[in-house]
């Protein structure tokens, strides 16, 4: 299911019939999703501080996570958090959780291949992908605004948005 989703997401779906929870994170990990297992419970949230509010969750420092936080700043190894027992669901992964089951699996991986297209074909493909991406982001129920930092790209983006 997640392979077919296009965009940024982190979500949970409860299947009442199977008594299962399905958690998933987008392909590149843009949206965060943290979790911890506390006895029979799976506690999850988009921020660690929300998990720490759970009465059974203790804020115990994870040395590896703290070293990364101070060593490389906001960048970090996928899956690592500054607190013991609290993990970040890696990009392009999902979890299926029930009382007697915990499955964590990668649903997608970036693949590389040799580039054989001509410059013209490459430019055509990039234009299509860029326009498709922008057009999907323009779907909104509120007025849209465009904020572009790079001046030389501004006119191009505005033309696509029209």
What are these regions (language model features)?
Residues 1-162:
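Cysteine-centered catalytic environments shared across enzyme families
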């Amino acid at each position: 299911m997640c392979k077919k989703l296009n965009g940024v997401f982190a979500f949970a779906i409860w299947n009442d019939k199977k008594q299962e929870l399905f958690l998933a994170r987008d392909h590149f990990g843009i949206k965060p999703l943290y979790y911890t297992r506390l006895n029979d419970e799976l506690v999850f949230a988009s921020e660690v501080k929300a998990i720490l509010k759970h009465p059974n969750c203790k804020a115990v420092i994870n040395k590896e996570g703290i070293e990364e936080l101070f060593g490389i700043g906001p960048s970090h190894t996928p899956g690592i958090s500054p607190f013991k027992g609290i993990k970040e669901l890696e990009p392009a992964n999902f979890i299926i959780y029930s009382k007697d089951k915990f499955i964590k699996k990668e649903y997608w991986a970036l693949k590389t291949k040799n580039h054989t297209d001509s410059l013209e074909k490459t430019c055509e493909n990039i234009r299509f992908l860029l326009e498709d991406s922008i057009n999907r982001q323009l779907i909104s129920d509120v007025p849209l605004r465009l904020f572009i930092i790079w001046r030389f790209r501004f006119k191009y983006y505005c033309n696509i948005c029209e």
